[in-house]
């Protein structure tokens, strides 16, 4: 439990770092009106905050910067929302209430607006196809004696295909493989995508397929990739190109890493199934190669079966008091789409 004084100092460090983008020392805080403490007191509490894991030392200076624990505490307990953000709410209302847009168009345009208002990459997944779409058909189409096409069709009419080749094996024919896919089809048709992902990875399916072929892991991976692709097509991004124009994003290698992050399926795992406002600092996640970036996300629910997530990807020094109210407002009003 942090003392009131430590809370004030931690809040000041986070917001000073966000504003100046420089490691924070006690001398830079002593002039703040909310910190009526001596430089020695501030320095002592900053040392204690570092020992407790809320701050970390910057090796290139004597100052300190927030750790993920520090950001988490700040965002959960100390953040004061900047209600000047409400000046942008009518722009969000205009998008949400546009009667000419279907739901996915509303989400796409809202993400573009969120990018415009924050200047950071905005993204959305939704509505949640994994819990809203069922597999209606799986087709196996032989192309020749070594290659085939697997088509997976949902009850929403969405289609994904995967190519499969037997060039690496002589253990079965293409027609034997068709029989195996028929076994898988019988297990998956009629199931929600979320159920299908669990079934295809179950020991029962693995053991069943293993009776016929040795490359069952590769076959299962094809199905999982197809299921993930359904969600990928329902994922929207805005503001990726603008990042390259910012001074702090001028490192080409960094841009490549960010692009890889956005394209990887792991991003879906980060954003989906979160409750309430969630924040992930990239260098705390082994899934992401990028350091010093924060993903802020919040879910929305149009109804019980149409759920999604909106998010902002930006540097850890984002101006959270302005950005978080926009995310929260957009989430609330996307959840009212059926009422508009």
UniProtKB/Swiss-Prot annotation:
Superkingdom of the organism of origin: Bacteria
Full protein name: Heat-inducible transcription repressor HrcA
UniProt entry keywords in alphabetical sequence: Repressor, Stress response, Transcription, Transcription regulation
Gene: hrcA
Function: Negative regulator of class I heat shock genes (grpE-dnaK-dnaJ and groELS operons). Prevents heat-shock induction of these operons.
A family per Pfam: HrcA
GO molecular function: DNA binding
Similarity field: Belongs to the HrcA family.
GO BP annotations, alphabetical order: negative regulation of DNA-templated transcription
């Amino acid at each position: 439990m942090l003392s009131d004084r430590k809370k004030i100092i931690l809040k000041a460090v986070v917001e000073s770092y966000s504003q100046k983008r420089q490691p924070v020392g006690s001398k830079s805080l002593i002039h703040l009106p909310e910190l009526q403490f001596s430089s020695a007191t501030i320095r002592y509490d900053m040392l204690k905050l570092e020992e407790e894991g809320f701050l970390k030392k910057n090796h290139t200076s004597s100052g300190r910067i927030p750790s993920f624990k520090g950001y988490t505490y700040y965002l959960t307990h100390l953040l004061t929302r900047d209600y000047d953000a409400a000046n942008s709410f009518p722009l969000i209302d205009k998008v949400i209430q546009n009667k000419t847009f279907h739901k996915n168009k509303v989400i796409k345009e809202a993400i573009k607006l969120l990018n415009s208002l924050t200047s950071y990459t905005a993204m959305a997944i939704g509505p949640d196809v994994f819990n809203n779409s069922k597999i209606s058909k799986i087709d196996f189409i032989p192309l020749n004696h070594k290659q085939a096409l697997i088509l997976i069709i949902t009850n929403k009419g969405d289609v994904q295909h995967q190519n499969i080749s037997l060039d690496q094996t002589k253990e079965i024919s293409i027609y034997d493989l068709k029989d195996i896919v028929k076994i898988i089809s019988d297990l998956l048709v009629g199931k929600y995508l979320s159920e299908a992902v669990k079934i295809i990875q179950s020991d029962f399916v693995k053991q069943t397929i293993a009776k016929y072929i040795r490359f069952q892991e590769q076959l299962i991976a094809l199905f999982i990739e197809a299921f993930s692709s359904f969600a990928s097509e329902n994922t929207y991004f805005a503001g990726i190109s603008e990042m390259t124009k910012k001074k702090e994003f001028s490192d080409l290698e960094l841009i490549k890493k960010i692009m890889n992050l956005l394209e990887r399926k792991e991003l879906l795992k980060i954003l989906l199934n979160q409750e309430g406002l969630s924040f992930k600092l990239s260098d705390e996640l082994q899934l992401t190669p990028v350091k010093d970036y924060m993903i802020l996300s919040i879910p929305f629910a149009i109804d019980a079966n149409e759920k999604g997530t909106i998010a902002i990807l930006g540097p850890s020094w984002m101006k959270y008091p302005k950005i978080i109210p926009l995310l929260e407002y957009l989430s609330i009003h996307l959840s009212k789409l059926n009422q508009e």
